[in-house]
UniProtKB/Swiss-Prot annotation:
One of its GO terms (molecular function) is rRNA binding. It is found in: Mitochondrion. Its main location: mitochondrion. GO terms for cellular component: mitochondrion; ribonucleoprotein complex; ribosome. Keywords: Mitochondrion, Ribonucleoprotein, Ribosomal protein, RNA-binding, rRNA-binding. PROSITE patterns: RIBOSOMAL_S13_2. Part of the small ribosomal subunit. The gene is mrps13. Belongs to the universal ribosomal protein uS13 family. This is Small ribosomal subunit protein uS13m. The keyword Ribosomal protein applies.
Length: 169
């Protein structure tokens, strides 16, 4: 087992400078070199040649270093997890609304928009009003009006027949 700093574990078989610079955010080659020099070690030393007291010195120096993120190393994974959770919430909302999760909606997803905006518009209300008034204005309205008229006539005839049957009994 190598040096453990917060949640990060450094590899024993590689040089400490390379591991520090690769694994810890905010540590470059020069900072890693200075940390190792402050701990009193040679720059090219590997992790398996360190004593526990030297490991503790390196960890203490890194935790006191002001240029780095706080002593809780490994926050990158937690931050990414938060971002993923927020993305999932957004996706859930989009799916519930019926919109696409990714991509444009200004020019794309027109079928969804059409389905959502289904309502009785002004044209259909006008047609209903004309039918009620009895004056169709165009060919389609006349067809509908004539069909309705025929249906009403059939109903009236059926009602008259049923009334005649009742009076005979």
């Amino acid at each position: 087992m190598g040096i453990v700093i917060g949640k990060i574990e450094l590899n024993n078989e590689k040089q400490i400078i390379g591991e520090l610079k690769k694994k810890i955010k905010g540590v470059n080659f020069h900072i890693a070199q200075k940390v190792i020099m402050l701990s009193g070690n040679v720059a090219s030393i590997k992790g398996n040649k360190l004593i526990q007291s030297e490991e503790k010195q390196i960890v203490d120096i890194l935790q006191r270093f002001k240029g780095l993120y706080s002593h809780n190393y490994g926050l990158k994974e937690e931050a990414l997890a938060k971002i993923r959770r927020i993305e999932n919430v957004y996706r859930y909302i989009r799916v519930r609304q019926g919109y696409p999760v990714r991509g444009r909606t200004k020019s794309n997803a027109n079928t969804v928009k059409r389905q959502r905006n289904v309502s009785t518009g002004v044209k259909t209300k006008r047609k209903k009003m004309y039918l009620l008034n009895g004056k169709p204005t165009n060919r389609k309205e006349r067809k509908i009006f004539n069909k309705l008229k025929k249906l009403q006539e059939k109903k009236n005839k059926e009602q008259k027949k049923s009334q005649k049957c009742k009076t005979k009994k």
